[in-house]
From Swiss-Prot:
Signal peptide interval: none
Protein residues bound to IMP: D13, E14, G15, K16, N38, A39, G40, H41, T128, R142, Q223, T238, R302
CDD domains, alphabetized: AdSS
Cofactor annotation comment: Binds 1 Mg(2+) ion per subunit.
Similarity remark: Belongs to the adenylosuccinate synthetase family.
The entry's keywords: Cytoplasm, GTP-binding, Ligase, Magnesium, Metal-binding, Nucleotide-binding, Purine biosynthesis
One Gene Ontology cellular component annotation held by this UniProt entry: cytoplasm
Catalytic residues (positions): D13 (proton acceptor), H41 (proton donor)
Organism: Corynebacterium glutamicum (strain R)
One of the record's GO molecular function terms: magnesium ion binding
Catalytic activity: IMP + L-aspartate + GTP = N(6)-(1,2-dicarboxyethyl)-AMP + GDP + phosphate + 2 H(+)
Full protein name: Adenylosuccinate synthetase
Cofactor: Mg(2+)
Gene3D superfamilies cross-referenced by the UniProt entry: Adenylosuccinate Synthetase, subunit A, domain 1 (3.40.440.10), Adenylosuccinate Synthetase, subunit A, domain 2 (1.10.300.10), Adenylosuccinate Synthetase, subunit A, domain 3 (3.90.170.10)
Length: 429
């Protein structure tokens, strides 16, 4: 039995899709425990590039059963568009299963998301506008719509009307928008009921029975540690807990059953949207990483902010997730750049911080303290073992490992599934 949780260790876009694609073919179930269609990822299989938004990368596995867990918020229109798009390219999404307890994104959630961001103006968080935050807000306010609700029209209508009683007051009186008609929302959900019904399961029961039978489960977290609503750079965060603890809650797999916590981390750092970013680059090297690394958001098309590797964040992510292993990605992007700065600590008002500063204000004013290592000039994209890497690349990886709080078990040297060096197999412990 193995229950492995995959967690982004930075601000997202670390390459979680690649890690899931590699491990997904070796497990029985791949579960997405949190998030929605607000965080895309790219997977390259057989030379074909797939851009996924709501579905877990495990949907491309030929053997694993992909599951959307109870912690996911699901836009049904986006779900079936993504399924249809995959099947049009020959992929088989028929094994997909969905927790009956997952919450649904309603059209009014997207409306609320957009008007709230517009109202905030310069104070806007920079959401994707897909209604994820308002859906989670309804969940914790106990007025959300769950997957199971669309199979009982009476309950569905009651819940939609209840939710809109308040939202229409806000839309009309505060934002000067038209009221949303409840019956239109009800019919929107009902139109998907027949297609959705065969996919719906008691995911917690299925997954725990699988583990009891000695099967392997992979939990594919969305977003990343620094976007966690509790542990991230609040308020510039997502609305869920994309950390290892959140994966347990969002899948229904108890924390004592998790055998490995695998952090995914880039050989440099990126971020999308607003918020503090100590190692951010505003010079030619920022543009270089953006261009060579292909740092454009899958979901939004926005260019990612780029900076050097931040070991303070890595140590923090190791701590809050209990990482047993790291999967380092995009090492190849650093080939030929001369020297590579590594952030080893922060300076905050003249005081050195080796760990995350206590307050948001301190983090916002943190200045990185760098040490520098020489880069390598050799092409590493065909390297199959750690020993195949140039010595300077080996030294860089080992230094990151020393600084980051967990062993480096996988090293990505290119975008392809086969462009990965395996030092330790997390399925073997």
């Amino acid at each position: 039995m193995a229950a492995i949780v995959i967690v982004g260790a930075q601000w997202g876009d670390e390459g979680k899709g690649k890690a899931t694609d590699i491990l997904g073919g070796l497990v029985d179930y791949v579960v997405k425990p949190n998030g929605g269609n607000n965080a895309g990822h790219t997977v390259v299989v057989g030379g074909e590039k797939y851009e996924l938004k709501l579905l877990p990368a495990g949907v491309l596995s030929e053997t694993a059963t992909p599951i959307l867990g109870n912690g996911v918020v699901i836009n049904l229109e986006a779900l079936f568009e993504e399924i249809d798009g995959l099947e049009a390219r020959g992929a088989d999404a028929s094994r997909l299963r969905i927790s009956a307890n997952a919450h649904l994104v309603a059209p009014y959630h997207q409306v609320m998301d957009r008007v709230q961001e517009r109202f905030l103006g310069k104070r806007a968080i920079g959401t994707t506008g897909r209604g994820i935050g308002p859906t989670y807000a309804d969940k914790v306010s106990r007025v959300g719509i769950r997957v199971q609700d669309i199979f009982d029209e009476s309950i569905l209508r009651q819940k939609v009307e209840s939710a809109l009683d308040y939202k229409n007051q806000v839309l009309v009186k505060m934002y000067n928008r038209k009221a949303i008609v409840a019956e239109e929302i009800v019919q929107y959900f009902l139109s998907y009921a027949d297609r959705l019904r065969p996919m719906v399961i008691d995911a917690t029961l299925v997954l725990n029975e699988a583990l009891d039978q000695g099967k392997h489960v992979l939990m594919e977290g969305g977003q990343a540690t620094m976007l966690d609503v509790d542990h991230g750079t609040y308020p510039f965060v997502t609305s869920s807990n994309p950390t290892a603890g959140g994966a347990s809650v969002g899948s229904g797999i108890g924390p004592t059953k998790i055998t490995s916590s695998l952090g995914i981390i880039k050989a440099y750092t990126t971020r999308v949207g607003a918020g503090p970013f100590p190692t951010e680059l505003f010079d030619k090297w920022g543009e270089y990483l953006q261009t060579v690394g292909g740092e454009v958001g899958v979901n939004t098309g926005r260019k990612r902010r780029c900076g050097w590797y931040d070991s303070v964040i890595a140590r923090y992510a190791s701590r809050v997730n209990g990482f047993t292993d790291y999967f380092l990605t995009k090492l190849d992007v650093l080939t030929g750049i001369g020297e590579i700065p590594i952030c080893v600590a922060y300076d905050v008002d003249g005081v050195r911080h080796d760990e995350m500063p206590l307050t948001q204000s301190e983090f916002h004013h943190a200045t990185p303290i760098f040490e520098t290592m020489p880069a390598w000039d050799e092409d590493i994209t065909d390297c199959k073992t750690f020993e195949d890497l140039p010595q300077k690349a080996q030294d860089y990886v080992r230094r990151l490992e020393e600084l980051s709080g967990a062993r480096f078990s996988y090293i990505g040297v290119g975008p392809g599934r086969d462009q990965t060096i395996v030092l330790h197999d997390v399925l073997e412990g």
